[in-house]
């Protein structure tokens, strides 16, 4: 699995940040202003201590204005002492309090604006990640999914994206705010006492090292939890799809036991993750307290020394500023914990996003033209990884003709059909439509030539109308009804509660097998493709349903070029050519009568089905 280093993590996040650069800039500006007003508000404590309560008896004189801290500090003290002399200490205290309130208002106001500008980035990144992940899943070729569990893919799209949203995106604000606050505060600490600050910076990395060790362990356990969650979701998906088989074989206890074992392993891993995560706050608080204690001791030594340049009030201000670093540092530590927790999910997401689709669109595609002549397989060979599935296939399918593919399971029938719309690409040879190699067309144009009706009708949890119009834009109600009538589906559709607006349930679960198949045929009729692919479309139906579906198929096949995969040989007697496949090769071909006379594999299959 792809490992995401710290640099790769930053690059990965930057891929999604592009549209939100304005938000990032505004957030940084607001955080800087918030930090500035924070320093200013706390700086008011020093004159209160040193002048108002006469910690120092010093006379200040006005200095010509210059952009340096000594001049600014001297002139601030000058105005305050003058105000005390003219208006008294009580009014001065009130004025300083007003300044403190105003500074705090601007500090909190800019802090809110920083969050206000970063929230669209945070929510937008998650939305964009979901969109890109879904688009990638739709765009990837079928070979990718043959190596992945469906439940694991669903976990990446739902659980992992949710984890990234919870762990990483919730930390974006802390990552954008706290480093700025910490750097500005540390700069202020250097100004107050560079010796004390250098000592602090020697102590802090030790705390960071301890936190980092725990965070690394957290990331590892989080990855285990996500992988186990994918296994759990896979079993749930398989259980829901195979309940009939589970009950028929009295396997309820077995699958429940297996699920419980998966669930227990997930529970143990999540327990370890949460324990490590909950360690972050008390550990950071303890280390922060230890650091403050060390600063108090070392700072006290500096103040008590005779040559100290730090006053007691400056040290108190130093402690206040240092204490204000603790909270951003703790939040930053928590953010890093969250990121370590979410990076495991980000790695799993990026594995899909970075998956390479071997089906490449040609740079200068051949423009689509009406299908007028023939489909040709020329010396076509294909393999899954190292195993050859098709070997040296040659086949010509003239326009308007029906060609049937028969043979035992695993002989290569479905693979041969899948190569035509480029669900996979041939390894050797070529497939052409009207003499044009299918690889030189856009996938959209190529697949626009074709309509599919499969053994298992693929329907969606939507209305009858939307299932029939799937992939066909701007279809009218009259066109949909006409397609349904041709497919022998209109009558049962109108008998439903809301007719064409009736929801058919998950995968068309509210319909019978024959009804689902007829909706699938209606969808193909509405698309009106010149090339039709029928994959064992009636093999799983009862006699009455098969009759209705077969009649609908005959209506669909009129004047169309048709490729049929069938196990029931009685349905393809009228095919213009029947190709018998065995171990990836076409071993017999001809009409039904020709193949019976040949007395080969086809006749054996036909005789077995006639018994």
Q: Which functions belong to the PLM regions below?
A:
Residues 361-362, 368-611:
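ABC-type nucleotide-binding domain
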Residues 188-202, 276-347, 352-353:
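Helix-loop-helix
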Residues 1-43, 50-100, 106, 114-118, ...:
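Membrane-integrated ABC transporters
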Residues 23-36, 173-224, 297-310, 327:
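Transmembrane helices of ABC transporter permease
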Residues 2, 6, 37-46, 50, ...:
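Juxtamembrane helix-loop junctions of ABC transporter transmembrane domains
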Residues 16-22, 142-143, 159-168, 172, ...:
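An intracellular "coupling" helix at the cytosolic face of ABC transporter transmembrane type-1 domains
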């Amino acid at each position: 699995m792809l490992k995401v280093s710290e640099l790769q993590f930053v690059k990965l996040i930057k891929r999604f940040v592009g549209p939100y650069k304005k938000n990032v800039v505004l957030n940084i500006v607001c955080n800087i202003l918030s930090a500035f007003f924070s320093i200013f508000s706390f700086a008011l404590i020093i004159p209160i201590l040193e002048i108002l309560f006469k910690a120092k008896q010093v006379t200040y004189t006005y200095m010509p204005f210059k952009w340096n801290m000594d001049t600014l500090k001297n002139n601030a003290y000058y105005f305050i002492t003058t105000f005390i002399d003219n208006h008294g200490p009580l009014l001065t205290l009130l004025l300083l309090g007003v300044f403190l309130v105003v500074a705090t208002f601007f500090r909190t106001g800019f802090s809110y604006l920083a969050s206000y500008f970063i929230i669209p980035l945070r929510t937008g990144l998650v939305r964009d990640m979901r969109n890109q992940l879904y688009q990638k899943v739709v765009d990837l070729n079928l070979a990718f999914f043959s190596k992945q569990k469906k439940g694991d893919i669903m976990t990446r799209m739902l659980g992992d994206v949710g984890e990234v949203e919870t762990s990483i995106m919730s930390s974006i604000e802390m990552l954008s705010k706290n480093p700025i606050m910490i750097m500005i505060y540390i700069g202020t600490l250097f100004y107050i006492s560079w010796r004390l600050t250098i000592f602090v910076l020697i102590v802090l990395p030790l705390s960071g090292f301890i936190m980092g060790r725990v965070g690394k362990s957290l990331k590892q356990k989080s990855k285990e939890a996500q992988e186990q969650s994918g296994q759990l979701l896979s079993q749930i998906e398989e259980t829901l799809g195979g309940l009939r088989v589970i009950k028929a074989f009295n396997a309820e206890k077995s699958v429940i036991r297996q699920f419980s074992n998966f669930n227990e392993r997930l529970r143990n891993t999540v327990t370890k993750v949460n324990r490590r995560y909950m360690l972050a706050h008390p550990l950071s608080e303890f280390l922060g307290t230890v650091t403050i204690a060390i600063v108090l001791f070392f700072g006290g030594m500096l103040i008590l020394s005779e040559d100290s340049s730090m006053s007691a009030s400056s040290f108190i201000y130093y402690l206040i500023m240092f204490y204000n670093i603790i909270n951003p540092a703790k939040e930053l530590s928590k953010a890093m914990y969250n990121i370590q927790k979410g990076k495991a999910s980000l790695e799993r997401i990026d594995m899909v996003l970075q998956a390479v689709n071997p089906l490449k669109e040609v740079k200068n595609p051949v423009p689509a033209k009406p299908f007028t002549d023939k489909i040709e397989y020329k010396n076509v060979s294909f393999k899954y990884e190292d195993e050859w599935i098709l070997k040296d296939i040659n086949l010509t399918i003239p326009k308007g003709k029906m060609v049937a593919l028969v043979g035992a399971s695993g002989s290569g029938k479905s693979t041969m059909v899948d190569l035509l719309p480029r669900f996979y690409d041939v390894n050797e040879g070529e497939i052409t439509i009207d003499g044009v190699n299918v690889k030189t067309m856009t996938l959209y144009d190529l697949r626009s030539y074709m309509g599919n009706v499969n053994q298992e009708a693929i329907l969606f949890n939507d209305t009858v109308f939307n299932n029939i119009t799937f992939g066909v834009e701007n279809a009218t109600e009259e066109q949909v009804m006409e397609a349904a009538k041709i497919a022998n589906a209109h009558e049962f559709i109108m008998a439903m509660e809301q007719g064409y607006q009736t929801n058919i349930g998950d995968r068309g679960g509210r319909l019978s097998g024959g009804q689902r198949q007829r909706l699938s045929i209606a969808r193909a009729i509405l698309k009106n493709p010149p090339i039709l692919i029928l994959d064992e479309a009636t093999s799983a139906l009862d006699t009455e349903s098969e009759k209705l579906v077969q009649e609908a198929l005959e209506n669909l096949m009129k004047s169309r070029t048709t490729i049929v995969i069938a196990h029931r040989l009685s349905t393809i007697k009228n095919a213009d050519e029947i190709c018998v496949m065995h171990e990836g090769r076409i071993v017999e071909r001809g009409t039904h009568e020709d193949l019976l006379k040949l007395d080969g594999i086809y006749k054996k299959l036909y005789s077995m089905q006639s018994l």
